[in-house]
């Protein structure tokens, strides 16, 4: 995939000595928290001519490479440039249980995780799992989007709920959970 994807690693904190090349770009960054790293990565990705989509992924998150390939294909085929793909967060010690599948904003300006504690092993859960609800936020453990659809950047430093703010500022986005 080295000709189709670029991996931008924004290292917040102590510099690492890893040469960039072969589609890998390492950026040593002041430790400005997750949002600082994500925004720095977004700025750097915007400087690369052939980059159209990015995936924000926490350093402690994991996914299958196939998830990245399918997300890329999905975004390339999306007719709406405001389409965002977010991934479910599962419990690492019990991956059949969903922690969050996006979140829904309520009138009290709070967000509530969608499909929280849904057990994906249960047959009765399949209808609930497949029922796509309009969500207003996707966590940055897996958040993929078209960089040309971004109007506002988040703070370039950590603020609790920075991913919530980013989602709220871009609420016109059509967020899809895959």
Task: Go through each PLM region and give its residues.
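Donor nucleotide-sugar recognition loop
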Residues: 136-142, 151-168, 173-177
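Acidic donor-binding segment of Leloir-type glycosyltransferases
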Residues: 1-27
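Hydrophobic/aromatic residues located in beta-strands of well-ordered beta-sheets
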Residues: 7, 84-85, 175
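Conserved donor nucleotide-binding strand/loop of the catalytic core
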Residues: 20-36, 44
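A recurrent flexible, glycine/aromatic-enriched loop bordering the glycosyltransferase active site
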Residues: 116-142
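Short beta-strand-to-loop acidic/aromatic patch adjacent to the donor-nucleotide binding site
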Residues: 50-62
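Conserved donor NDP-sugar-binding/catalytic core segment of glycosyltransferases
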Residues: 66-112
């Amino acid at each position: 995939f080295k000709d189709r994807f670029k991996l931008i690693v924004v290292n917040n904190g102590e510099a690492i000595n890893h040469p960039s090349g072969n589609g890998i770009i390492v950026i040593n960054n002041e430790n400005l928290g997750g949002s600082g790293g994500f925004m720095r990565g977004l700025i750097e990705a915007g400087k690369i001519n052939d980059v159209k989509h990015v995936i924000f992924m926490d350093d402690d998150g994991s996914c299958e490479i196939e998830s990245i390939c399918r997300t890329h294909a999905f975004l390339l085929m999306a007719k709406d440039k405001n389409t965002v793909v977010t991934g479910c967060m599962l419990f690492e010690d019990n991956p059949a249980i969903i922690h969050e599948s996006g979140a829904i904003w309520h009138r009290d300006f709070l967000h509530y995780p969608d499909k929280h504690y849904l057990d994906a092993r249960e047959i009765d859960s399949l209808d609930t799992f497949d029922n796509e609800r309009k969500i207003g936020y996707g966590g940055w453990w897996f958040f993929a989007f078209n960089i040309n659809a971004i109007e506002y950047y988040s703070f370039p430093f950590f603020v609790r709920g920075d991913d919530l703010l980013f989602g709220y500022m871009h609420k016109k986005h059509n967020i899809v959970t895959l």
